[in-house]
Amino acid sequence: MKTKNSKEQLTPDNMESQSLEVSMLNKDNFSDKELESYLSKGEIKATDKITIPPKILFVGDCTIATFGNFSASTGKAKSKKTFNISAMVAAAVTNTTVLNYRADLPEGKRKILYFDTEQSKFHCHNVLERIYKLSGLSLQKDDCRLLFWGLREYTPKLRIALIDYALRKHDEVGLVIIDGLRDLMYDINNGKEATDVMTVLMAWTSVYELHIHTAVSYTHLRAHETKANL
């Protein structure tokens, strides 16, 4: 698989169909060689020099996002979660303060990928316009620091594959938005599916050294928590 540091430009013709992180979800058996490789990769030694992950988003003096982690906006349906995310993204695009959010993405990690899994193209475009207006960007020119996709018409499995592909294709990504996390699953009450999606999120944040922010409704959170407590 071509890595993010490869000099050759990644295209659909020279890329593998999925990353190692996603392909692992479909495997039940691992060879000793694979297990040794994964175990070695995960080993942490006292002599390792591990730097503090960059803090990239703040509300006042409180850090709300760092590289290598993911977070979520939660609330009832139609509770302005998307507006909250719009303000966050607007701050991140310009590395300034927008409403209550302040952003400080490092150079070389300024690109933002936004995936909406629920809304129509019309409503997705409204969200994108709102971000541009909040950040003071001109609507007459596309800003290459922010890429936006609507994935409403695709299956959960294809949505995961498309996000995975975008992460492998685009360099210098510091922030990923997934508005509609539950749409990466067929059944929100399926414990294995929920664990698999969380595992992929953790892998993406670690492998690509970025932050993922998602939107989740209380209804979906309660459904999964009820299932987990049975």
What are the language-model segments listed below?
Residues T219-A228:
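Conserved small/polar residues in nucleotide/adenosyl-binding loops
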Residues D196-T214:
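Substrate-engagement module of ASCE P-loop NTPases
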